[in-house]
Amino acid sequence: LGLTGNMARLLDCVAPGGALIVVFIRLSALFNSSCRSKITITTPLLQHLPIGSGITNSMGAVEYRFATFFVQAILMLCVTVLLLYFFFTRRRLPMKEGCPRDGNVAWMFLTFHSAVELLMDSTRYDSSFMHFNAFVSIVQIVSAVCILAALIHYSRLSHKVNGRCGYHVAMWIGYVLTLAGTGAAEYLV
């Protein structure tokens, strides 16, 4: 693009700001009825933020649902703090000798944001929720692919630096098992 000679370093600088932008985008759902859950909250003590949020249903009555947007905003704020810490203290340190120094903050953002979306998107139920099929959303599929990309990237780096190890196989088996477990849980819900 010609913006910089080192794109990975530029993405490292943008990653904490990107996470903070996601926080504000999620908090903007407070002013509309999007990003609410299927879970109805009937306990009056829990019918306020951070757990519940009121929406008006088609009959004109107010019902309280799990505030997915607020929980996502809190989780992404935690990711922002973690990325800022990592950016200011460890960004120039390679993960291991022989690994690249730049790009790790951006990979962490991609992985953590995808994990939050993969987890929380299953609770959403609104007009902007895009189904891929009857039980898995497009956002969940894209999040799983992003986590897979990070897994491939770091597996290649680790294989190059450490050689072939048993924990690579264990890590891949763990990814496949958690992906299968997530799919089964989504299907059963």
Regions found by a protein language model. Name each.
Residues 1-189:
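A feature for loop-to-transmembrane-helix boundaries and adjacent hydrophobic helices
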